[in-house]
């Protein structure tokens, strides 16, 4: 299963990331990658984030991995939308593909190519829900952790003696 994310569309739609982009787009991109990395870990899906670089003179398409995520920058003259459409075309026959974008035109195109769509708001809501589930799960695991139990502090011989005493009752 794949989630393809229209990077700048999501950054511009999420107010928490928009604040970062005012300082630097690089910082906003890093924060998006960080958020989606934990989301990917919980969901167990392959996430590809696509960023526009079509205005970069002489720019070639760049692909690299950032932890479990794949990051793609479009080449000069090619929009992120075009890269997303190409990926959907390549992947949709053999896998479930969902595209995260609030671009209405892009949603129509990817739906026509056999992919699902999720808006920026829907992705944000799911991300918040996943973060809460991770937090609750972590809290529960901390509550169940019992360091320094008696069994961990005594020798094997002492455990045998105590077990024998317990059985005599």
Please tell me what each predicted stretch does.
Residues 1-3, 9-169:
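Nuclease catalytic cores that cleave nucleic-acid phosphodiester bonds
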């Amino acid at each position: 299963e794949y989630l393809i994310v229209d990077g700048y569309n999501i950054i511009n739609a999420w107010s928490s990331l928009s604040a970062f982009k005012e300082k630097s787009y690089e910082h906003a991109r890093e924060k998006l990658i960080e958020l989606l990395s934990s989301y990917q870990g919980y969901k167990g899906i392959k996430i590809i984030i696509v960023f526009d670089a079509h205005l970069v003179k002489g720019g070639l398409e760049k692909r690299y991995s950032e932890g479990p995520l794949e990051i793609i920058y479009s080449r000069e003259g090619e929009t992120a939308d075009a890269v997303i459409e190409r990926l959907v075309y390549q992947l949709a026959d053999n896998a479930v593909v969902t595209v995260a974008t609030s671009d209405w035109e892009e949603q129509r195109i990817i739906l026509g190519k056999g992919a699902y769509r999720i808006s920026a708001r829907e992705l944000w809501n799911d991300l918040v829900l996943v973060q809460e589930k991770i937090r609750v799960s972590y809290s529960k695991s901390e509550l169940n952790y019992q360091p320094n139990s008696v069994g961990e502090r005594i020798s094997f011989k002492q455990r045998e003696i105590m077990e024998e005493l317990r059985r005599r009752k």
